[in-house]
């Protein structure tokens, strides 16, 4: 754990779950540290068993089976050791990749009252704890989620994460969907600038505090996102083709979708929506952090 806040009261803990060296960069990145200092966040990075060739089986990503309780126990221990008692019941920002992306989608249903926001990247895991089996209550689906995928992801693909997004977005979830065109199962550090902008907006809306209930998000204001997709020649673990974004924009709430466009979520401001559009329409993204 890192405490950029010093002796100030921690408003929330940003949990970045180790799933390879790319996602681990978030924990020590100077811009992330500055962001945490500005918003009075603690940074926590649980380590996991190796994703490949793990002793025994891979992690069980259902937080009800131990990992959720273990995280809360760790925060209670940090509260005592650090002199920050507020950590014992602090609110959480979640960031996970691949299997831990699926974990942090499930986690929202496990402890929705504690979660400020969940960033779910390239989410996927073995059945029955994959992204397609996440079950969220009407309260849990109102927790903001940022769902990110790679257009050339042969592991988790694009369709299953999108189906998860679409199912709950159509039930009123204030979520956003982001595609990194032609990007394989890796390299989410490329999303850092947009991710920090999104988190900044969500933190300001939800006003996390260990002693207060999180504010809800009013998605009647803001921007509705739409995309046009283009199939690639890559297939995921289940044999489903992946896809990239070949067009993106915004539309008025309640408007009929233009031909070929599908929903891609909601963002709280026009500025953030323009940054999203610029990002998802980039032809390619750097892949300098392959695991």
Where are these regions (language model features)?
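Short beta-strand-to-loop junctions in surface cap/lid or active-site-entrance loops
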Residues: 1-10
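Alpha/beta-hydrolase-fold serine-hydrolase catalytic core, especially in secreted/extracellular enzymes
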Residues: 171-172, 181-291
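Short beta-strand element of the alpha/beta-hydrolase
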Residues: 9-20
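Primarily recognizes the serine-hydrolase "nucleophile elbow" in alpha/beta-hydrolase
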Residues: 81-142
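The feature captures the conserved acid-bearing segment of alpha/beta-hydrolase catalytic domains
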Residues: 116-196
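The serine-hydrolase catalytic nucleophile loop
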Residues: 24-32, 48
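Conserved alpha/beta-hydrolase
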Residues: 39-53
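Alpha/beta-hydrolase active-site loop
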Residues: 58-86, 94, 106
């Amino acid at each position: 754990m890192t405490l950029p806040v010093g002796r100030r009261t921690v408003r929330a803990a940003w949990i970045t779950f180790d799933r390879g060296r790319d996602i681990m960069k978030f924990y020590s990145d100077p811009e992330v540290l500055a962001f945490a200092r500005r918003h009075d966040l603690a940074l926590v990075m649980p380590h996991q068993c190796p994703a490949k060739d793990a002793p025994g089986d891979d992690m069980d990503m259902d937080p009800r089976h131990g990992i959720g309780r273990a995280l809360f126990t760790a925060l209670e221990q940090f509260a005592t050791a650090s002199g920050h008692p507020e950590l014992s019941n602090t609110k959480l920002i979640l960031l996970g990749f691949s299997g831990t992306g699926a974990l942090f989608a499930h986690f929202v249903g496990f402890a929705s009252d504690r979660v400020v926001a969940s960033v779910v990247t390239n989410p996927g895991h073995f059945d029955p704890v994959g992204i397609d089996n996440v079950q969220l209550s009407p309260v849990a689906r109102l927790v903001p989620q940022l769902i990110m995928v790679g257009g050339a992801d042969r592991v988790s693909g694009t369709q299953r994460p999108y189906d998860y997004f679409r199912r709950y977005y159509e039930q009123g979830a204030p979520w956003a969907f982001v595609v990194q065109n032609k990007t394989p199962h890796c390299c989410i550090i490329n999303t850092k600038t947009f991710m920090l902008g999104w988190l900044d907006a969500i933190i300001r809306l939800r006003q996390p505090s260990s002693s207060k209930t999180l504010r809800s998000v009013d998605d009647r204001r803001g921007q509705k996102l739409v995309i046009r997709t283009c199939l690639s020649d890559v297939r995921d673990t289940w044999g489903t083709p992946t896809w990239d974004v070949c067009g993106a924009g915004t539309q008025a709430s309640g408007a009929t979708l233009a031909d070929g466009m599908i929903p891609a979520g909601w963002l709280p401001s026009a500025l953030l929506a323009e940054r999203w559009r610029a990002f998802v329409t980039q032809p390619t993204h750097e892949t300098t952090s392959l695991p």
